[in-house]
A protein has these predicted regions:
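Short basic/aromatic active-site micro-motif
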Residues: 2, 218-219
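Short, surface-exposed, low-complexity cationic segments
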Residues: 67, 215-216
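A structural motif corresponding to the C-terminal end of an alpha-helix
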Residues: 95-100, 207-211
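Conserved core of the PLP fold type I
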Residues: 1-99, 111-126, 197
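PLP-dependent aminotransferase class I/II
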Residues: 130-209, 216-218
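Short, conserved active-site loop motifs that form the nucleotide-linked donor/cofactor pocket
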Residues: 101, 129, 213
């Protein structure tokens, strides 16, 4: 896809109709919520805490609004930096199974996130979940390349929507990315970037704590 943003747009266009309720995280990425609202969706904010979403609020929406999707940045949440706990991930998936909505996992920061962080789609094995990610955060911002993975029964609808939208993604960019992956350059670059960010995070936390700041959750 043309970045993770287009992947999210494809999911919305393929699976939703104007007026459909969609659960989103509060706070969260304002661009995604504005896009959903512009498409005529009913945006349902779910408070996001250090461990995950407010399950009581989700339960209430499920019982009264019958949401179609729950859009979540589960790892390195924007803007809080929270990472979904394994227990919360299981709770979300159980609710998705019970009420029939899909969890859209926006894993934009996957290349710089901790390896041990739980992913909803890994736990779920793409039954009630859709995985979205991209490469702009780790390679070049102007390389708008992304991808999505979805349950088999949704793939054809998503592919048709992609073809009707942009037909294809620029081939030279795809080939350059494929070469980076085949030669191991992407993996090595991501490892160096994670090390650099870990050092910067440690210094930043120490400076903030020395200045009297405290954190609700570990950055």
């Amino acid at each position: 896809t043309m970045g993770a943003t287009q992947a999210l747009d494809i999911v919305s266009r393929a699976l939703l109709q104007p007026g459909d309720p969609v659960m989103v995280e509060e706070p969260g990425w304002a661009v995604e919520y504005a896009r959903l609202a512009a498409m005529g969706m009913r945006v349902l904010p779910v408070p996001r805490g250090p461990e995950g979403p407010d399950m009581a609020v989700m339960q209430r929406y499920c019982e009264t609004m019958a949401p179609k999707l729950y859009v979540s940045v589960s790892v390195l949440h924007n803007p809080t930096g929270y990472t979904l706990s394994a227990a919360s991930a299981h709770e979300v998936l159980q609710m998705a199974q019970r009420y029939g909505f899909y969890v859209v996992e926006d894993d934009t920061y996957c290349h710089i996130a901790p390896d041990h962080a739980p992913r909803v789609t890994v736990l779920d094995r793409l039954q009630r979940s859709i995985y979205v990610s991209g490469f702009a955060k780790v390679l070049v911002p102007n390389w708008r390349l992304g991808y999505l993975a979805a349950p088999p029964e949704l793939v054809e609808r998503l592919l048709d929507t992609k073809l009707l939208s942009t037909l294809s993604t620029p081939t030279p960019m795809e080939q350059a990315l494929a070469l980076c992956m085949e030669q191991g350059q992407l993996r090595r670059h991501a490892e160096r970037l994670r090390q650099h960010l870990a050092q910067a995070r440690t210094r930043s936390v120490a400076l903030a704590q020395a200045a009297g700041c405290r954190f609700v959750a570990e950055p």
